[in-house]
Every structure is written in structure tokens, then in C-alpha cells.
Amino acid sequence: MLILPIVKGEYKKDYNLKHLTWFKVGGNAEIFFKPLDSEDLKSFLIQNKQKLPIKTFGAGSNIIIRDGGIEGVVIKLGQNFSNIEFVDNHLIVGSSCLNYNLAKFCQANAISGFEFLVGIPGTIGGGVAMNAGAYGSEFKDIVVQIEAIDFAGNFLTFTNEEIGFKYRSNNLPKNLIILKAVFKINKGDSENILLRMNEIKNARSSTQPIKERTGGSTFANPEGRKSWELIDKAGLRGYRIGGASMSEFHCNFMINNGDATAKDLEDLGDFVRQKVCEDSGVKLEWEIKRIGRHP
């Protein structure tokens, strides 16, 4: 019998995750848990005597949940983890805060350096985890430190150097949940910041299929190369498997055309990797995460 820790937050069993993802595919979470606050999360982790497998879930913007669902507990940090506050000339931001919301907050408060976030879907926690970046900036450029908790329930702090930011990755321990990020503040001009944000939004809408069911960039760019160019060169623009296709508009974006399964999407991505490797000798690395069980 499955015995769950006593918590103040909310449990849901056999919870459908499909509606939480941008691709709108995938199976159910065996257990879905939204902690009330960081102390509630700590209590859950300490009590997790059965050592149930744990996965964390953000905005669902760059993830494929496999059709067999996710075993164990999926933890989603809700609105109580999305606060933005000023402390000693720094911003402390909850990990579930959306990148877009932080960009808007910074513009309203004449804080520069965060404009690029308006073009990156997802949460602050996810952005830190993958060192998300666009339009010449990355999270490594603005993060001072993060506050996190490990799966044993220990609160930890990591500086920018300790995080070890790399291209779309970092050196943080795997069994870690990011709670907050601390950012440095550089004052700017609100109107100029808004102009830059609008430039980024316009550039994004003119080059990316933002109105489709997509998960953002499918593959990370190899050093000195562009993934979309390699995909295009291999003749895979618009290529389709089942209900999934590579976008005609931007061929490093995978799209659910309405009836795709998670398997369709993952099979398509793996096929593209194989064909690009055969054509160009380059092995593309997934930027979209794939988690869960195959059916």
C-alpha cells in the first residue's frame, strides 16, 4: 500500500499532466503534489521513507511527458513559489515565477538586463536549470546565486560559480529542487527597456511558430553551427511522423498538429537526429526534456 507523507499542500492521484504541457501530450502522474510552501516541501522530502521517485515540473514549455506517464511523485511548485522581492539591491525571485512576468516586472521598475526573458517561455527555475538564453543573453549573466532543497530535505545555496553554468546546462546535483534565484540589479531606462522587449517579441513572432503546440527549440545548437540549418540541409523541414512534424516555419521546432502522441514526437526527434548525423556527421543533442515511461 502506498503511504504518502502528511502534508499541508495538495495531492492528486493518477493526475493527467497533458493539459499542463505546451505539447498537450503524455500520460498521468502516479501522484501529483503541490506543496503549500518550502517548509511543506521539506516535510514531504524528509518523510518520504518509501523513497518514492521524484520528478519536478515547471511550466511544461520544453518537455515531453511519455505516454506511459510518470511513476512516483511529480512535484509542481505553485503560485506560493512565484514571489518577486527587493532585498539589498538584489531581486529574489521564486522559481515558479514565469520568465515573462519577471521581464515585465523589471521593465516597470527600470531594471535592465532581463529583457531577453520576454522571449523565453517557462519558469525561472527551469531557466536556471538549463541556463536558458536568447538574443545574446543567458541566465548565467544575471544570476548571483540560487536557493534550493535536496531530496533529503536539506536547504542549500549555490553561487553562480558553484552552479557551473554551461550551454543549456549546469553542474548542479541532480536530486535538487530550485526554490529561489537571486539576481543582481542594474538600473536602466523603462522606455528603452520596453523598446528592447518589443524588438525581441517581434523577432520571436516573425521567426518562430509561437501559435502552435510546440516546445521551443528541439535541439541545442552544436558549437559553431545552427541546428535548424542542419535539419533543413537534411531535407527534414516539414517532415512528419504521425501527428508530429518539424515546423515549416522554423525547422528546429517540433509541432503537435493536433493528434500527436508523445511517441510520435520522440520518434520524430530521434529520426531527425539520425538523419542529420548521416547527412552532416553532427549528432544533435535534445534541448527538450523527455520524461516518464514508455507505454
From Swiss-Prot:
Location(s) in or outside the cell: Cytoplasm
Provide the E.C. number(s) assigned to this enzyme. 1.3.1.98
Identify which cofactors the protein needs according to its UniProt entry: FAD
Q: Spell out the InterPro entries in the cross-references.
A: FAD-bd_PCMH, FAD-bd_PCMH-like_sf, FAD-bd_PCMH_sub1, FAD-bd_PCMH_sub2, MurB, MurB_C, MurB_C_sf, Oxid_FAD_bind_N
The kind of enzyme this is, by top-level EC class, is oxidoreductase
Q: Where would one find coiled-coil regions in this protein? A: none
Q: Does the keyword Ubl conjugation apply?
A: no
Q: Which residues form the FAD-binding PCMH-type domain?
A: 24-188
* Pathway per the UniProt entry: Cell wall biogenesis; peptidoglycan biosynthesis
MF terms from GO for this chain are: FAD binding; UDP-N-acetylmuramate dehydrogenase activity
Q: Which Gene Ontology terms of cellular component type are present?
A: cytosol
Q: Which HAMAP family does the entry mention?
A: MurB
* Family according to the record: Belongs to the MurB family.
Summary of the function given for this chain in its UniProt record: Cell wall formation.
Which named protein is this? UDP-N-acetylenolpyruvoylglucosamine reductase
Q: Please tell me the species this chain comes from.
A: Rickettsia conorii (strain ATCC VR-613 / Malish 7)
Gene that specifies this protein: murB
